[in-house]
């Protein structure tokens, strides 16, 4: 088992061990993931504030289907012009209602979006790895588990919260029904599947003001592993 639970001191693997820095050369590549509304964006922001280079796959997935892109043209070809709003931009709500209810539709969308996002992410990753000094590159990937990418990273960090709290957050954030929130959760990998690939588990059920303590602890261990690897 490869796990460090930062939230409650349960540790089965020490983050500061040198074998966490598989990439060597002064770079640690972190795969950050978790279910919908599990706090990934908050954790990603906090890691960025501590010096990590953040590659936000959600943002990239929006960029590659912006107005005028080939990605948007492919989406319209696959799903029709009803997924556009009046100004020609993507109607994410309309598209979401299609793909969350239909596995085959979701796979068609992923086949369009994922290669474009991967190309963009690779460019950012290469630029970060070419920089001088010690670098932590965080790939914030909502579908890391679903796409089987855990082994690509030196550290896999999972944001974890009870599913009932996920539902509450989704309903509050998006104004959808509980049924819709549950459908979105069930469309992703399960909580157990996320935890199974985790090297580090961040407990995001804690009050927001308590979360930086967890981030500081894992950041110091990853940074310590980097320094150890450089000696």
From Swiss-Prot:
Listed EC numbers: 2.7.1.24
Coiled-coil features, chain-numbered ranges: none
Keywords: ATP-binding, Coenzyme A biosynthesis, Cytoplasm, Kinase, Nucleotide-binding, Transferase
PROSITE patterns, alphabetized: DPCK
Catalytic activity, as annotated: 3'-dephospho-CoA + ATP = ADP + CoA + H(+)
Pfam family, one: CoaE
Binding site for ATP: 37-42
Enzyme class, broadest EC rank: transferase
Main localisation: cytoplasm
Residue stretches making up the DPCK domain: 29-231
Name of protein: Dephospho-CoA kinase
Gene3D superfamilies cross-referenced by the UniProt entry: P-loop containing nucleotide triphosphate hydrolases
GO molecular function: ATP binding; dephospho-CoA kinase activity
Entry's Gene Ontology cellular component terms: cytoplasm
Function of the protein: Catalyzes the phosphorylation of the 3'-hydroxyl group of dephosphocoenzyme A to form coenzyme A.
Gene Ontology annotations of biological process type: coenzyme A biosynthetic process
Gene that specifies this protein: coaE
Pathway where it operates: Cofactor biosynthesis; coenzyme A biosynthesis; CoA from (R)-pantothenate: step 5/5
Entry's family note: Belongs to the CoaE family.
Annotated localization: Cytoplasm
């Amino acid at each position: 088992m490869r796990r460090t639970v930062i939230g409650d001191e349960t540790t089965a693997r020490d983050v500061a061990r040198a074998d966490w820095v598989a990439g060597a050369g002064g770079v640690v590549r972190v795969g950050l993931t978790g279910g919908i509304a599990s706090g990934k964006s908050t954790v990603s922001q906090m890691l960025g504030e501590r010096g990590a280079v953040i590659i936000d796959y959600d943002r990239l997935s929006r960029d590659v289907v912006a107005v005028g892109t080939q990605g948007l043209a492919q989406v319209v070809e696959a799903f029709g012009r009803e997924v556009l709003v009046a100004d020609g931009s993507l109607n994410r709500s309309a598209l979401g209602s299609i793909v969350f209810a239909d596995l085959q539709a979701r796979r068609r969308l992923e086949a369009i979006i994922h290669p474009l996002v991967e190309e963009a992410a690779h460019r950012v990753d290469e630029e970060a790895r070419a920089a001088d000094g010690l670098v932590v590159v965080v790939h914030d990937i909502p579908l890391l588990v679903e796409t089987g990418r855990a082994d690509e990273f030196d550290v896999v960090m999972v944001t974890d919260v009870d599913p009932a709290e996920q539902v509450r957050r989704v309903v509050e954030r998006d104004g959808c029904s509980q049924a819709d929130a549950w459908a979105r959760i069930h469309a992703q990998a399960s909580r157990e599947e996320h935890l199974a690939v985790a090297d580090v588990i961040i407990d995001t059920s804690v009050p927001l003001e308590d979360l930086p303590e967890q981030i500081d602890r894992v950041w110091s261990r990853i940074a310590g592993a980097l320094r150890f690897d450089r000696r």
